[in-house]
């Protein structure tokens, strides 16, 4: 039985309903993700489907990795905007820090995963470079950057995401996760779902990126895979943190955190807030149990411009995904059904009662001074 049987079966699917199968070379026997990962355990082969670049080609594309081309930076290294010459194409080039968080294994995993798995809601890997000790990945360029840029790190004067766009982004991310869980063979556990890893195309279609921590999921009668605990604090499922046991429900929990960020406009961990509000999930849990307080979770920057029913149901979805007991969490297919219904209802609903609108307005005014500082900062992919 669906976890969201209370939702209508009507599904809004602006992003296409078909789920492509894992990638395989034309005129060749079908290869599962597991078979190819095992075959390429010591390094990617030349027939992976991704283009192999020389370091010189990528240096030329990024103007020798000039600062003016830098669009993102983190523990893994730096991301540059580049332009390939043949064929002419704008790309994003991730140059891994040789002493950074993403090592040889993570580089290999990302090349293999993105060479095999193709979906509208996964970022497209164009190629890679493994010259000497240089490790670089070349992706399609995403001009809008990450969800984090538009939700948590707004530039001064930048317009916040409206409610319908937030639901659209959540739906796209959910479809990407569902593809990994249900269509890949064997299933893939993403393990690093967070707002900075969700990239946006010009139409705000969400694409999952950074697959270095992805792991092949359990097969047959196996219920979980054991793994060293990795990921980003605040997004990791509590049972995974405690035991190292990884399941697809670990990704569902992380999705619930991202959905809560989309609803609230708050960071999952924010040490600049009062102590009882610094952990987003901990702060939200008592509100989940009191529907009369749901409006308190809405992002003040929305200024009350959202359908009350859509907000309430989005919060209900987030609460299910964040359930302490993994088996109670929904499947991503159920999440997609629920969010698709929300997308449909958001386009046809009004914003609720005058009393609720006044509460929203007051909440917005109370938050203006707060949000004018912490959420307006500089950040990239």
From Swiss-Prot:
The modification Phosphothreonine is found at residues 54, 232. The keyword Lipoprotein applies. A lipid is attached at residue 3 (S-palmitoyl cysteine). Pfam families: Pkinase. Residues 16-41, 347-381 are annotated as: Disordered. One of its GO terms (cellular component) is plasma membrane. ATP binds at residues 71-79, 94. It comes from the Eukaryota. Keywords: ATP-binding, Cell membrane, Kinase, Lipoprotein, Membrane, Nucleotide-binding, Palmitate, Phosphoprotein, Plant defense, Receptor, Serine/threonine-protein kinase, Transferase. It is a lipid-anchor. The active site is at 192 (proton acceptor). The modification Phosphotyrosine is found at residues 139, 240. Disulfide bonds: none annotated. The keyword Cell cycle does not apply. Belongs to the protein kinase superfamily. Ser/Thr protein kinase family. May be involved in plant defense signaling. This is Probable serine/threonine-protein kinase PBL25. It comes from Arabidopsis thaliana (Mouse-ear cress). The lineage of its organism: Eukaryota, Viridiplantae, Streptophyta, Embryophyta, Tracheophyta.
